[in-house]
Amino acid sequence: MSDLKDLKEGDAIPELKVTPDKYLPHRYAGASGDFNPIHIDPEFAKAVGLPGNILHGLWMMAQVARGNAQIADGDPRALKRLSVQFRGMGFPEQELVVSGTVKEAGDGRVVIDTIAAQGGNQVIRNAQAELAAP
Amino acid sequence: MPVNTDAIGKQWPAATYEVGAEKIREFADAIGAGSDVHRDHEAAKSVGYRDLVAPPMFCVVYSARAMGPAILDPDVGINLATMLHGSQEFEWDEPVCHGDVIDTTTTCREIYEKDGKGFYVFETISTNQEGKQVVKGTWTNIVRGV
């Protein structure tokens, strides 16, 4: 277990990099129950003006959750709160990078400002995670 | 046209979800949560969980069932074709494990208009079979061109 107490304001957390494959949105649709066709049907997505089928926002949020949980060795009890703003469309077959900086630290609790981006496209902004030693 | 705010404060009946091991494994695979505590009963118990534990973001699975009726309610009046998921917050408490029965209640907290867009804010509260709160969700949906 990484010690959250060792983190201090301004520290960067390790980046999480993940490239969703072409069919990831289909698997996430099944796992989550969200079968909105804009996520799984490229032709439907184009017909409503999108460049192609887009990633589920909540899947991207799950990557932000995972990126933050890494600092507690992925212990699911450590993540106490996560807020995100969805500000861009994410696409399959493009690398998603989650990065963050410690905003507050003390008493075994840390608050981390986080973003998720595909290249220069920030798909999640102003995300804030709060973690505490379980 | 101003947004109709009559539904502020409306609450929908609780939706019940029974948490199962294979759904936890499927969800953990889909989001890339690699830990054994999401897959192996004994691994989870050995680090203090009651049983195989769901990743925190599994909350979307049991919350979605409670959010659906709220988003589709004509009293709220959301135009789904122009709806975007604007922001999301979850606050977690008690972990959710295989065998848990989760009740989720949705309440409409805010409806307002800004820059020609309608903002619809819902709160979900999920509790387990022991009455312990497992997660609170705040869902902000934005509807363009209201």
Enumerate the language-model features and the residues they cover.
Chain B
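HotDog/MaoC-like acyl-thioester-processing domains
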Residues: 1-3, 87, 92-146
